[in-house]
């Protein structure tokens, strides 16, 4: 008999964020941001132990933001077309990149994503990467 699929959906930019400021229109420095590395082996094991077979990571694709990552070769977006400082995780700017906010080391963001996939598989779960093809940034 096939195993029943039970999906745990999570928004990594909220998961593990210890900053409780929650300032409206705040910067990443003011409000903080969860990181891919917050999903440790222990955290993933506890999610698996609750009976989940898959983790649906939502909002990991690079999207419009007012945070300046130009030193990493990421173009800046005009503030008037970005939803808040953090931007919407559905305002995609590059379907082939990971949101730099989610990385401890921005230049290693893809490696951090690959390591999270490996940790998730090691914990006995499969990965679903949120992908909404008709949602893009305004520029």
Predicted segments with their positions:
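N-terminal structural segment of carbohydrate-active enzymes
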Residues: 1-126, 134-138
């Amino acid at each position: 008999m096939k195993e029943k699929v039970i999906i745990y959906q999570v928004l990594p930019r909220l998961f593990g964020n210890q900053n409780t400021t929650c300032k409206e229109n705040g910067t990443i420095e003011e409000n903080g941001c969860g990181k891919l590395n917050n999903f440790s082996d222990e955290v993933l094991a506890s999610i698996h132990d609750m009976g989940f077979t898959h983790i649906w990571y939502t909002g990991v694709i690079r999207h419009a933001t007012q945070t300046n990552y130009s030193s990493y070769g990421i173009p800046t977006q005009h503030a008037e077309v970005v939803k808040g400082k953090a931007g919407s995780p559905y305002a995609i700017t590059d379907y082939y990149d990971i949101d730099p906010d989610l990385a401890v080391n921005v230049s290693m963001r893809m490696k951090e994503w690959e390591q999270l996939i490996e940790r998730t598989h090691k914990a006995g779960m499969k990965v679903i990467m949120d992908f909404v093809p008709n949602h893009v940034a305004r520029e």
